[in-house]
Amino acid sequence: MNLRSILPVLCTLFPLLTFAQERDSVIHSAYGQDSVSCMMEVSVYARRSEEIVPSQRLSGKRLESLSSFSVADAMRYFSGVQIKDYGGVGGLKTIDIRSMGTNHMGVFYDGIQLGNAQNGLVDLGRFSLDNVEEIALYNGQKAQIFQPARDYGTSGSVYIRTRRPRFEEGKNHNLRASLKGGSFDLINPSLTWEQRWSKRISSSLSADYTGASGKYRFRYRRVLPSGQVAWDTTAVRQNGDIRSFRVEASVFGNTQDGTWNAKAYYYDSERGIPGAIVNNVWKHSQRQWDRNFFAQGQWTKHVSDRYKFQVSGKYANDWMRYLNPDTTLMYQDNKFRQNELYLSTAHHVELLPGWQMNLAADYQYNTLDASLTNFVFPVRHTLLLALATQYEYRRLRLMASLLGTNVWDRTTKGITSDPVSNATSRWTPAVYVSYQPLKDCSDLSLRAFYKGIFRLPTFNDLYYTEVGNASLQPETTRQWNLGFIYSHDWYRGLFRHVEVKADGYFNMVDNKIVAIPKGSGQYRWMMMNVGKVHIAGVEAMAEAVMRWRRDWSLVLCLNYTYQSATDRTAPTDNDPYYGTYGGQIAYIPWHSGSVAGNLSWRNLGLNYSFIYVGERYHTSANIRENYEQPWYTHDLSATYRWQLPRLALTFALECNNLFNQQYDVIHNYPMPGRNWKGSVKVEW
């Protein structure tokens, strides 16, 4: 699928257009058309019903104020999140919540999950913040029960909500253009056009291009167990270039008794894979090409005050080529193509005042084609059934769900062999409770939850040539959480809003899917269910909003995480030097945290952020050779907005890693030192 074949689809979809405004500073009716009116500024901090579920979010000006280029960069400021970052603008960036594993994360883009049946990974580095309005992180699942069945099926969820058109009174279109540039030869132009076609229909068309050489200087230093310095040199990171193009068209509509929306998305990239710095090899030659397309839509109808339903659908086509031209290792030129079809219906009923119920059914169809020898061309059918209920009585709120997962895989072994089928069927529960202990004070809430869920082996886990294992069982997780949230608002004085929340948790991961040596040699590997992990941790967050002299405001946010994530696979594997039993699992720090501050005066903004990741090991054998030092970065940025009669200009300058800290997130993948970005944005 190339760009030329995608553009007609976008052009066909674009005139079908609509939008329903959400929250923030816009006042609207339930199904009315959006408009923005100028009025005296008032700060409102509404209590979110979702707080029965531990959640974190970044949105609006606070999201813009962070020195972040992609969704992955912004999520570094969430507690309990580990970012696997291989460095540079084009490096792969995935996330892990509460040490349960990247594949247990669900990433939802405008309400529908992004899938990858091949390896289960979603590269959050490819989602620019230019078109993102809010990023929300939930432990377990969203608190609202009116949602598709697939939303109940992950251990943690990230919801990315793109920008919605907002129109000033008497205005029917918005145009926004921006240009970013900076270190690593970065160039990033973007353009967004928003149009109101009628009272009930509006649209958005957004596109951007990213180009960078990915070259940056780094210091490579390694010390032997004896204390002798083995390496200490400075080099330039090579083969980290990227060229990518993204375009998406969205249409939004309001009806008399509901809403609908549709979206088409296309992403095309070519990038180098810089590789690890090992064996005195400083430059690699591997390349990767990606083409991702999906079209999705949702329709919600309120039949009565007590009954509403939602229908969702999606088609996705993903193509990837991996090239390793180095014949001294093994020449590879592999191509993969995935197809996904997804349909969902959800039905919400209010049985009695305070008692609600939701029934959802989803169907998903996945295929994978590959150019590998003896590949089995798997096909997967997934049927999900979810029943959820929510009950509120005075200061008590309960929510429970039961998810049924039925999966059928079908493969063809070679060209002439008979098909082989495999089936999985399981039911998994979740229970959430929230209670306000003080009768006359709604500022304090206690919360707790339990959730059991599993993740299916990916197509690579099951069927990758010579490595896959078709007998794999699902990898299961069980989560327990206990916490509180305190939130208070003031309408006068220095402090306008204070929020403190903390959660303690314990997670168990069983049947963990890992690669182990196959046979008598160590050069062949197979995926097996042999892993077990116990995770105990604490997350804490504090936020304060201050305002004085009308023009000045200050927002401060602190996050802290403690985690003990230990390998509990084999009690006999307790050798003091090579053993992994009881060791902290790879790349999970005991301590981590962040500080972010935003100081505003009229049209000027000054933003500071600090991120700290404590000591950790790059394998579960916690010995000196595997030790990774703590790292931290300071980021600083300044913005100025110049308002003119018909347009607004915003200038920004940011410095990341201000003190030039040399560090690795992943062992032997050096990260950039001090780097700069500048941008200008025009809105009219």
Question: Could you say what each language-model-derived stretch is?
Answer:
Residues 76-116:
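Extracytoplasmic beta-strand/coil segments of soluble accessory domains associated
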Residues 310-322, 446-451, 475-536, 543:
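Membrane-embedded beta-barrel scaffold of Gram-negative outer-membrane proteins
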Residues 22-27, 216, 234-248, 252, ...:
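Flexible loop and strand-edge segments within Gram-negative outer membrane beta-barrel domains
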